[in-house]
């Protein structure tokens, strides 16, 4: 269970960050961001306004444990995957992952407050290359870094997610989200 301080930290954006709901969050059981119990992953997404990249605040709960007292590398890779995909969606690319590389830098203690940063690094036709970093929330300690190649799909394949994405990001651009 998260403390009141943890919940406040998750919800409070840094200067230049705007809260955002990613399109997949309309799904109740999203693997990464669909845990309402706080036992697995607790995270909130933000747009970094100066460069329109994605930021997230995340706390890895006891349900992410791998090595005793530390987050499983797969949970760290899953957070990077979702954040990097979200960064592509925020730039107008409805994508799915084709390739993901994660490099683990340090063990991540359970309950640590972390920040995820993700940004589109290149677009080549249907391929969208994205990079990301998972770091300590109040410092520079890197826990993981990653790169991914996402493939843009026909928006019709995403059904309601596409219209939700258009609504969310137009509201964000108008300052309402």
Where are these predicted regions, by residue range?
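Short coil/loop residues immediately preceding or within conserved phosphate-binding loops
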Residues: 40, 97-99, 129
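Short beta-strand micro-motifs enriched in acidic
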Residues: 46-48, 119-123
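Active-site helix/loop of acyl-thioester processing domains in fatty-acid/polyketide metabolism
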Residues: 53, 63, 70-95
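Hydrophobic beta-strand-centered segment that forms part of the acyl-chain substrate-binding groove
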Residues: 1-2, 8, 82-115, 121
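Catalytic strand-loop segment that frames the active site of acyl-thioester-processing enzymes
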Residues: 25-71
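Hydrophobic core residues within well-ordered beta-strands of beta-rich domains
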Residues: 41, 52-54, 114, 128, ...
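HotDog/MaoC-like acyl-thioester-processing domains
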Residues: 1-22, 108-110, 121-177
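Residue-level recognition of well-ordered beta-strand positions that form the cores
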Residues: 57-59, 101-103, 117-119, 133, ...
